[in-house]
Amino acid sequence: AQVVAAAQAELDVDGCTVIKGFLRSEALPQLSKEITTIRPQLHESLIDINPYFSEGDPSLPHDHPVNTFIERSGGFIPRDAFNPTSDFEAVYQNPAFLSFLSDCLNVPEVHCFADPLAGLTINVLGPGQQFAWHFDTNDFAVTCLIDGAEEGGLFEYSPGRRSDRTENFAGMAEVLADRPAGRASVKTLELHPGDLQIFRGRNSGHRVPRVGVESTTR
């Protein structure tokens, strides 16, 4: 009950909570091994995106957030790569886990995403790769770190950078330009393998800066 109450409070404040050591340390090597087994089905990409996953607008200034495109690199392993008996699938579909998430999010129910590709994914960042600043199109995301990088790759977010009523382009421009006001709004999470993160990213800009060029894959 204390864990759920703390998660609810943190989500209400800035849309992010972390449950430390959610996955047992003794389970992590097996999960990491499973990722290695299905890694040949990794889909990698290298594109430039703005925070809104939209096209630019020539009627706006060149440094407007809509016209600010930054490299997004990395890859993902889609759900159809997993074996039906996968340990990841077992956790993902566990009714107790779904009930726990709904309690933390303070919603009546949470259901598994039915998309055969995006329902359950492994996100992979190799040396020198990054996820650029962006807003999510979904209401929330649930992520668990399996393998961390030795350098870089820490999750950064700017809580409530926009709202359902206003885009706050000026505020996002501060973040993108790394100006003092923007930097002051950014929080950094140092996640460790086994940590579970619940994040409401629709209105909170976030990114994963570059993984160190000599680091292992995150």
Where are the regions that the model predicts?
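Non-heme Fe(II)-dependent double-stranded beta-helix
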Residues: A1-Q2, D12, F22-A96
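Short, solvent-exposed loop/turn segments at secondary-structure junctions
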Residues: L23-S25, D147-A149, R162, N203-G205
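Catalytic core of non-heme Fe(II) oxygenases with the double-stranded beta-helix
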Residues: A81-E89, L98-L196
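Short beta-strand His + acidic residue motifs that chelate non-heme Fe in jelly-roll/DSBH
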Residues: F131, G205-G212
